């Protein structure tokens, strides 16, 4: 699987240049509606970033004829598929806000280690050397979710009740087909997990604060 020419490669990371509502770690006392709004916006940014990165990696490294068969095998690769987390909006609406926050926290924390190796996956470090910023944004979202948990649980988040897991780090040996497939699978899981976290946060925000943007 030889690397092909990259087209519009910068698009994969344009969202990294967009301003965030506040700096990382900045979750002071504020209305619950603002906490939810900020967390949802952060999750949307990260989900779009994950989707763009996955798409760019696929275009660059995965032959088109192999994509369908590989994608069919990727669901079992994601450990998040083995936990009782809702798989979509309808299922999420059947869970309590505290449950959804705990699942969101689990998903975010499972990627804090692996994303620190993300920049090493790509040969063009000037473009993809942004792993630290992705990590910072994940930490920022983690803190936002923990702030929401403190508000809703009336105390500190009970992290001990969440089974913490993590994914393997990305493989830097891009000359190996096995490494390429591993990274492709990891990026697929990253995209899926960020989509789940975004969905959970949007469901919670919408049912607490009725608004026109609840249709998604």
From Swiss-Prot:
Q: Which keywords annotate this record?
A: Disulfide bond, Hormone, Metal-binding, Phosphoprotein, Secreted, Signal, Zinc
- Per the UniProt entry, the signal peptide is 1-26
Q: Name one GO cellular component term.
A: secretory granule
Write one Gene Ontology MF term.
growth hormone receptor binding
Residues the record lists as binding Zn(2+): 45, 198
PROSITE patterns membership: SOMATOTROPIN_1 (PS00266), SOMATOTROPIN_2 (PS00338)
Q: Which residues carry this modification: Phosphoserine?
A: 131
Task: Quote the Pfam families the UniProt record gives.
Answer: Hormone_1
What are the subcellular locations of this protein? Answer: Secreted
GO terms of biological process kind:
animal organ development; cellular response to insulin stimulus; growth hormone receptor signaling pathway; positive regulation of multicellular organism growth; positive regulation of receptor signaling pathway via JAK-STAT; response to food
Which SUPFAM superfamilies has this protein been placed in?
4-helical cytokines
* SS bonds (residue pairs): 78-189, 206-214
Family per record: Belongs to the somatotropin/prolactin family.
Its biological function? Plays an important role in growth control. Its major role in stimulating body growth is to stimulate the liver and other tissues to secrete IGF1. It stimulates both the differentiation and proliferation of myoblasts. It also stimulates amino acid uptake and protein synthesis in muscle and other tissues.
PANTHER family cross-referenced by the UniProt entry: SOMATOTROPIN, SOMATOTROPIN,PROLACTIN
What protein name is recorded for this chain? Somatotropin
* Taxonomic source organism: Camelus dromedarius (Dromedary)
């Amino acid at each position: 699987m030889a690397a092909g020419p990259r087209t519009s490669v910068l698009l994969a990371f344009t969202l990294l240049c967009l301003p965030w509502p506040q700096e990382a770690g900045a979750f002071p006392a504020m209305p619950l509606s603002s906490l939810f709004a900020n967390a949802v916006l952060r999750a949307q940014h990260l989900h779009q970033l994950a989707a763009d990165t996955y798409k760019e990696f696929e275009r660059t490294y995965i032959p088109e004829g192999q994509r369908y068969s590989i994608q069919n095998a990727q669901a079992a690769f994601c450990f998040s598929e083995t936990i009782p987390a809702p798989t979509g909006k309808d299922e999420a609406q059947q869970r309590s806000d505290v449950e959804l926050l705990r699942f969101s926290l689990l998903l975010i924390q499972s990627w804090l280690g692996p994303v620190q190796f993300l920049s090493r996956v790509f040969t063009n470090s000037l473009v993809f050397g942004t792993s630290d910023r992705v990590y910072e944004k994940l930490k920022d979202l983690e803190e936002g979710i923990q702030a929401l948990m403190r508000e809703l649980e009336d105390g500190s988040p009970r992290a001990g009740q969440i089974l913490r897991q993590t994914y393997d780090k990305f493989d830097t040996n891009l000359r190996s087909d096995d490494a390429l497939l591993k990274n492709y699978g990891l990026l697929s899981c990253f995209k899926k997990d960020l989509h789940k976290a975004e969905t959970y946060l949007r469901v919670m925000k919408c049912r607490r604060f009725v608004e026109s943007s609840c249709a998604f």
